[in-house]
């Protein structure tokens, strides 16, 4: 029986190549066959490299790829991440013909480690709220989330083992939660943003979307120029954790709250320690501050685009809000965020908090008629610049629910 290599996570594909259980062309063909079958329904791709061109690149540099850490395996990037010679339209008709001359740093790092770009994934308009064409891989009537919609859908549907997204509010964590993937956003400044189209520079982050935490660790090591030894996740004997359920920020579904409570009880039953979370009011304030900072910066970054008629009503509304904010209000918001961050980090240090548990989204993916989903569960952590990860936690109506972990 023919192996379905496309269903294997990255680290297992690497093992198969290292042991001779599979060849690179065999694995790549498996992914292209999956894309050919599923893309008409999911519509995750903005631009796809032709299979013949992919394999020709591998064959022309076969010795390099066989000796490289990633062995020529495929990766994808969100269509706000520059790729030399390949269009980067940022989900907007305004930039439909834009072809960058340089790769983004994350693309360069992946290529240097032996990854081969398979394509660009669909993004919402300028990585904000206006949805693209992508459907949820488990239910075409539902949103895959935004703005890294194509990246999450492509990974969740086994069309590619690794995809990069970006997050300014909740654009990696939320779609990862909706689609049932692992979504990782590093600490502010952990990954280079060079040649990634900016939305709000104080908030923008690069994210990794995968189907396994070991794959996320491997790709994190690639971006940080670390040696790619076999990834090992070390378990801590006793975890000190706190829980924030997000109900003060907006409506969180009963199913999400029940899944979070079950996770909490499981940790306690295994001897881990919970500390009460005392910063609910600050989380609400941070969420509002995030909105102010984002609106101010987006309005100043998209000056060129404001002159065009192709902007969505969503984006026009954000620009209107941002232009109404003064520089003094913006600076005050940044200062307040920093003050809260220092208090929170001091408390986490004193209490020896390893992780904050929270919903990764308000619930399962909503119907597309309701938009791309509410981002309020990530705004506070994103404005603080803390590292976050979304992990598949449970299912409701056969749709994934994600757990968000926030660290220092």
Predicted regions and their residues:
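Acyltransferase
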Residues: 21-29, 59, 255-278, 299-306, ...
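Short, well-ordered beta-strand elements within core beta-sheets of diverse protein domains
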Residues: 12-19, 95-98, 204-211, 320-325, ...
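Gly/Ser-rich, acidic/histidine-flanked active-site/gating loops
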Residues: 6, 72-75, 84-87, 221-289, ...
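Short, well-ordered alpha-helical
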Residues: 1-99, 127-128, 365
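Short helix-loop capping/hinge segments that flank enzyme active sites or metal/cofactor-binding pockets
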Residues: 70-90, 292-345, 392-402
């Amino acid at each position: 029986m023919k192996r379905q290599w496309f269903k294997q996570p990255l680290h297992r594909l690497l093992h198969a190549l290292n042991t001779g259980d599979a060849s690179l062309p065999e694995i790549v063909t498996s992914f292209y066959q999956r894309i050919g079958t599923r893309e008409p329904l999911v519509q995750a791709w903005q631009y796809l490299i032709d299979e013949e061109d992919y394999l020709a690149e591998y064959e022309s540099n076969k010795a390099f790829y066989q000796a490289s850490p990633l062995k020529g395996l495929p990766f994808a990037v969100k269509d706000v991440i520059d790729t030399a010679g390949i269009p980067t339209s940022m989900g907007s008709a305004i930039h439909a013909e834009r072809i960058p001359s340089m790769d983004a740093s994350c693309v360069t790092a992946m290529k240097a480690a032996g990854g081969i770009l398979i394509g660009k994934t669909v993004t919402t308009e300028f990585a904000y709220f206006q949805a693209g064409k992508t459907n949820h891989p488990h239910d075409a009537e539902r949103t895959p989330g935004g703005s890294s919609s194509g990246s999450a859908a492509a990974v969740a549907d086994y069309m590619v083992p690794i995809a990069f997204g970006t997050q300014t509010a909740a654009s990696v964590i939320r779609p990862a939660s909706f689609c049932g993937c692992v979504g990782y956003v590093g600490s502010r400044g952990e990954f280079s943003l060079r040649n990634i189209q900016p939305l709000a520079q104080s908030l923008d982050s690069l994210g990794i979307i995968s189907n396994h935490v070991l794959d996320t660790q491997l790709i994190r090591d690639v971006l940080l120029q670390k040696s790619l030894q076999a990834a090992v996740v070390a378990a801590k004997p006793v975890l000190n954790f706190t829980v924030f359920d997000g109900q003060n920020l907006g409506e969180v579904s009963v199913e999400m709250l029940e899944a979070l409570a079950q996770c909490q009880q499981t940790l306690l039953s295994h001897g881990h320690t919970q500390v009460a979370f005392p910063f609910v009011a600050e989380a609400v304030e941070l969420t509002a501050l995030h909105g102010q900072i984002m609106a101010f910066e987006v309005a100043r970054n998209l000056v060129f685009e404001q002159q065009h008629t192709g902007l969505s009503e969503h984006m026009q509304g954000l620009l209107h809000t941002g232009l109404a904010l003064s520089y003094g209000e913006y600076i005050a918001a940044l200062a307040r965020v920093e003050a809260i961050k220092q208090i929170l980090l001091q408390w986490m240090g004193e209490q020896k908090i390893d992780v904050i548990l929270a919903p990764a989204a308000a619930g399962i993916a909503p119907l597309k008629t309701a938009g791309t989903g509410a981002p309020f569960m990530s705004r506070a952590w994103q404005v603080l610049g803390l590292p976050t990860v979304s992990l598949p936690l449970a299912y409701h109506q056969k749709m994934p629910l994600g757990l968000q972990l926030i660290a220092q």
